[in-house]
């Protein structure tokens, strides 16, 4: 299971950073089905497999932080037996998964407050946190027109469009990326997720920058939604510079903890 998860993350089949972090955390539970002669052997296996999961995508901030937390908390628990160490792993994984899932939900609920009945929203890529925001608005009785860009080359915007089309509250239009400028002018706001924010740079799916620049040109607010843990002050290197966009184009950033104005 761990090897399969590593391969899946490396091939970008899992696209949401929260989903990646949860999958990776749960993958470590597979070590609970194995036998180890000593606690030290178990901890080495935990560290080795966690390192493999982190290396599969070094640019996912949530993946990196949750994996480091898992390993450190298990090794610092001073478990005296292998079953005890495995039990600690189960508890920490459950806690981490709950926190990641609740952060996404809280950020989505906070972002939903920016949406008013009859608004037209432009989305780019597939973000589970943006999906949380839109569905929270729908549950509150808000009807929206949603323009979903395809987000080539993986066409993840198509998945967003298909998912949203299942809700009666949404009037969904799938837009080719090259036509974003035409549709943005009629939108009330753009809403996207994030891989992370490092100092003055937003990292997200390739193609986010031109959407943000076009939104700024036509005066449409560019709202970024995600977990507070994805805002990194420094000491974290995002490896794919093609995913960057300057924070001067963003306003605001909505997280589970706060609304940040830039």
Residue ranges of predicted features:
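Long amphipathic alpha-helical segments
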Residues: 1-98
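Ligand-binding beta-strand-loop-alpha-helix segment within the catalytic cores
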Residues: 68-117, 130, 144-186, 190
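Histidine-anchored nucleotide/phosphate-binding helix
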Residues: 127-139, 212
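Conserved phosphate- and dinucleotide-binding cores of soluble alpha/beta proteins
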Residues: 149-262
């Amino acid at each position: 299971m761990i090897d399969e998860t590593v391969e899946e993350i490396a091939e970008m089949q899992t696209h949401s950073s929260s989903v990646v972090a949860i999958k990776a955390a749960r993958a470590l539970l597979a070590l609970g089905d194995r036998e180890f002669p000593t606690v030290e052997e178990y901890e080495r296996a935990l560290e080795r497999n966690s390192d493999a999961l982190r290396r599969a995508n070094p640019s996912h901030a949530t993946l990196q932080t949750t994996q480091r937390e898992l390993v450190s908390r298990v090794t610092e628990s001073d478990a005296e037996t292998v079953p005890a160490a495995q039990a600690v792993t189960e508890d920490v994984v459950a806690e981490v998964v709950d926190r990641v899932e609740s952060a996404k939900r809280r950020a989505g609920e906070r972002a939903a407050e920016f949406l008013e009945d009859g608004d037209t929203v432009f989305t780019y890529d597939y973000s589970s946190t943006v999906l949380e925001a839109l569905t929270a608005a729908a549950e509150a009785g808000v009807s929206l027109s949603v323009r979903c860009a395809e987000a080539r080359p993986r066409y993840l915007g198509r998945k967003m469009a298909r998912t949203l089309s299942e809700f009666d509250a949404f009037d969904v239009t799938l837009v080719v990326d090259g036509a974003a400028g035409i549709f943005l002018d009629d939108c009330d706001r753009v809403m996207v997720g994030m891989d992370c924010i490092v100092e003055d740079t937003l990292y997200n799916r390739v193609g986010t920058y031109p959407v943000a620049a076009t939104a700024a040109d036509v005066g449409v607010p560019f709202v970024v939604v995600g977990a507070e843990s994805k805002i990194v002050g420094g000491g974290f290197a995002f490896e794919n510079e093609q995913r960057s966009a300057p924070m001067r184009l963003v306003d605001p950033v909505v997280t589970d903890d706060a609304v940040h104005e830039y």
